């Protein structure tokens, strides 16, 4: 029951003022006020960013927008989620410059992917120069989906994904967050809301095929199903199928709610995905370690060459000290020795 009404808990606590602890009431009231303010600015701020990028001829693809708020019956219940944009490396730098001009500041970096920027008003934007997936397979499949992105109406350079591909992106991200114990209930709520709103429009055969390409068709189906069980009814069928073994969902629920503290994973796709992520992380750590070694070796070599050039200066410099070298160049080694001996004697005097 709690999970079924979790999306309206803020309003529920506000309406039960006598029994609710004061600290809870204050926090929920602050959260609700933030949601109200965000609702006033999000559409304008999003259009402002996209219009500016479009006028600058900067091509970008919208991965997520605040448009999901329109799918909630009460808009303030939706999360204050950021606008998420994917750009190529060249456009990324230009877009960041435009955002800085609009008053956005970098709040945190996504190592190897992009950064999170926010403005004092509260609106936030994520910009990526690389698809934010920790697995190469997911990145490759997502790049295929981006090829189907369509130009957004009223824009020339701003693209958006079809509804099926938007849903696939959220499912792929949720699968990654699940196996790394970072999946939030809010993400599942958004998936449920989207599935219920777009169910009639979704090409389920296409979605299942693409999920198979991601190798998460079974795992993604379970995540959508458990979101329906939490926020809808247990009778909701995902992709036309009803679950046979309800114990599977107890495993998912325990892992998600405990953030991995209670983990008895039985899903083979989840186990394989976790192995892939760990391999990518190991590969990235090895790459960074190798990069540090190369950087240190380069610095050592530069120090060595500087010392070497001090001991054995170039020919033109030596000619300025010993003009005879211009007529007899083969005396250069003897001049080096003579100069270095004089310098050493000068140090010991």
What function would you assign to each model-found segment?
Residues 1-81, 87-349:
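Conserved NTP-donor binding/palm subdomain of two-metal-ion nucleotidyltransferases/polymerases, i.e.
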């Amino acid at each position: 029951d709690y999970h079924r009404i979790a999306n309206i808990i803020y309003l529920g606590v506000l309406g039960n003022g006598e029994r609710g602890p004061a600290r809870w009431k204050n926090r929920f009231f602050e959260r609700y006020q933030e949601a109200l303010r965000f609702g006033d600015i999000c559409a304008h701020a999003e259009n402002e960013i996209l219009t500016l990028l479009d006028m600058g001829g900067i091509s970008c693809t919208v991965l997520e927008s605040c448009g999901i708020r329109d799918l909630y019956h009460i808009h303030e219940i939706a999360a204050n989620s950021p606008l998420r944009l994917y750009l190529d490396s060249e456009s990324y730098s230009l877009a960041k410059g435009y955002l800085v001009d609009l008053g956005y500041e970098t709040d945190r970096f996504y190592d190897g992917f992009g950064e999170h920027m926010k403005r004092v008003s509260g609106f936030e934007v994520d910009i990526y120069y690389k698809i934010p997936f920790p697995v190469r397979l997911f990145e490759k499949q997502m790049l295929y989906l981006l090829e189907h992105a369509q130009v957004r109406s009223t824009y020339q350079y701003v693209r958006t994904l079809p509804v099926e591909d938007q849903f696939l992106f959220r499912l792929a991200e949720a699968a990654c967050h699940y196996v790394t114990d970072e999946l939030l209930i809010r993400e599942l709520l958004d998936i449920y809301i989207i599935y219920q709103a777009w169910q009639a429009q979704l090409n389920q055969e296409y979605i299942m095929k693409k999920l198979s390409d991601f190798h998460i068709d079974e795992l993604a189906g379970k995540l959508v199903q458990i979101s329906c069980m939490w926020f809808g009814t247990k009778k909701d069928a995902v992709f036309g199928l009803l679950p046979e073994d309800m114990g599977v969902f107890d495993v998912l629920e325990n892992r998600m709610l405990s953030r991995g503290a209670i983990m008895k994973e039985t899903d083979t796709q989840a186990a394989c995905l976790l192995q892939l992520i760990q391999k990518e992380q190991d590969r990235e750590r090895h790459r960074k370690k190798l990069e540090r070694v190369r950087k240190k070796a380069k610095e050592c070599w530069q120090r060595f060459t500087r010392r070497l050039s001090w001991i054995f200066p170039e020919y033109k410099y030596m000619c300025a000290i010993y003009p005879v070298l211009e007529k007899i160049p083969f005396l250069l080694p003897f001049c080096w020795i003579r100069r270095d001996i004089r310098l050493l004697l000068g140090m010991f005097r």
